Amino acid sequence: MKYYAGDYDVVVVGAGHAGCEAALAAARIGCKVLICTISLDSVALMPCNPNIGGTAKGHLVREIDALGGEMGVNIDNTFIQSRMLNTSKGPAVHSLRAQADKSRYSNRMKYILENEENVTLKQIEVISIDIENGKVKGILTKNGAYYNAKTVVLATGTYLNARIIIGEVAYSGGPNGLFPAKELTKNLMDLGISIRRFKTGTPARVNKKTIDFSKMIEQPGDEKIVPFSFLTDKLEREQVSCYLTYTNENTHEVIRKNLHRSPMFNGSIEGVGARYCPSIEDKVNRFPDKNKHQVFIEPEGEYTNEMYVSGLSSSLPEEIQVAMYRTVPGLENVEFLRTAYAIEYDCIDPQELKLSLESKNIEGLFSGGQINGSSGYEEAAAQGLIAGINAAMKVKEKDPLLLTRSDGYIGVLIDDLVTKGTNEPYRMMTSRSEYRLLLRQGNADLRLTQKGYDVGLVSEERYKRYINRRESIKSEIERIKNVQITNKKEVNEFLLSLNSSELKKPISLYELIKRPELDYYKVEQLDKGRINLPEDVQEEVNTTAKYEGYIEKQLEQVNQFKKFENKLLPNDIDYSKVYGLRIESVQKLSKIRPMNIGQASRISGVSPADISVLLIYLEHKYK
């Protein structure tokens, strides 16, 4: 028996990383939001790795923060170790990563949601979305409550029809021992939404007291802690170490002898797994010549003995897992606290979405996170943020926020999912972007904070900080362009001491910094008028000066890219009547219905010749 339970502008289904960002974004823009979760104890749960950020993922967190999201602030408040990755490489791929205290991360995010003015957080299982005349009307819960909703954001994570697999044991269950959502998939299929089956997995959690760390390599955090959020001032905190060890031939032998019992290899798993996060049995099978694989031991929090064993994800039977783990140096006497498992779950085809993350077929229905076929907390949070913003824009009858590939990694992520689709859990990598040098984690605010402010999400405090930082960078660049370094004897002696050639004539400090062996910091002695600026400002000034030529080339590429992005394709085009298009192109274009020529050009199966046909068609049809 159903009953009327209330009215909301936005209902968010799921309170994981996507759901939390979606709810907070919509609420902060001014919408009345209901966020539903199967368990109030699983808000912003981290059911797999205990860290935020990493290669490309750190960029996503910075971009979420720049737009006004919460993830960066939350990890800055709850991390137990911080490291900057890829520092030996160029600035485009420098990526921040932090170990989280899982419980504190989850509890703080729950507290933020509970205290956000326009948010109501409830323990509710949503079993159906009510649609009327092709538009969202409301949602129905398992307990019979019906809520009117102007928009709905699906952020169901890995819960839809979730199934846990450990060797020959398989049962219906969500991540971390939680309940699965069993009824919503059927409703989505009845609404005409395509459903696929994906798979992911997680390693065991082991007892810290049973680990011999003396046989491992300690991995401490960085001395200089760099925050994720542009709102966070200097961070100082006592950090907790991680540890590195390796598998060996004994480990691999245990796995090889028991591959027939692995669900990955005996056909018990239907779902497609993540290419870039393989199980240990998959790694051993795929790389038979490799005699060892890295294993990182990572703390799950400050006040727990649970340790995450990164690199040993598995779905082998429990007793085989224990035997296999105990062959690893330092884990000879290890005791399991939680068993490793694989999890299968339902997700949708992201090619049925617009770039706003709204369904092409159901008005007012948005989705974000693993339901869209992605993997990872950061990818989920990024999509949730955009879905939440655009649900709010829909309610307020404003244009959606559409991020392009040149705006940020979030734009790349969404464009890849919606335009190219994915046949496996999608993971963000820096190599997926054509404009890596422009999309640095250090300039995320310069790229995106204005956009966040324009949609009403960025607070006045954040906006003021952004303006101050932007102007500091701009004025410092102008200043060093006007600082002339002469070819005096003491200057040349200083340059020679840095293995840099002598000056033959005066040069600006800005030009001098471009020398490969020099940078903004090394030439401080020559810069008499330098004032003490924040480290992040100095870093941005240094990068802008040193890589100016490369940055300008990428900006030229972006301008060419935008010419195609600005050629809009009407949504009502009948591609079957466009003379000259190949049959495959007609099918792909009709399914995906790209917004512009640029998006059309990135669809698999649409050739450059097809793009030429479309350009000619537009020119003649819409003169």
From Swiss-Prot:
Superkingdom per UniProt: Bacteria
- Look up the record and name the cofactor or cofactors this protein needs: FAD
Which parts of the sequence bind FAD? G14, A15, G16, H17, A18, G19
**Keywords, in A-Z order:** Cytoplasm, FAD, Flavoprotein, NAD, tRNA processing
What are the GO MF terms of this UniProt record?
flavin adenine dinucleotide binding
SUBUNIT field: Homodimer. Heterotetramer of two MnmE and two MnmG subunits.
Summary of the function given for this chain in its UniProt record? NAD-binding protein involved in the addition of a carboxymethylaminomethyl (cmnm) group at the wobble position (U34) of certain tRNAs, forming tRNA-cmnm(5)s(2)U34.
What name is this protein filed under? tRNA uridine 5-carboxymethylaminomethyl modification enzyme MnmG
Taxonomic path: Bacteria, Bacillati, Bacillota, Clostridia, Eubacteriales
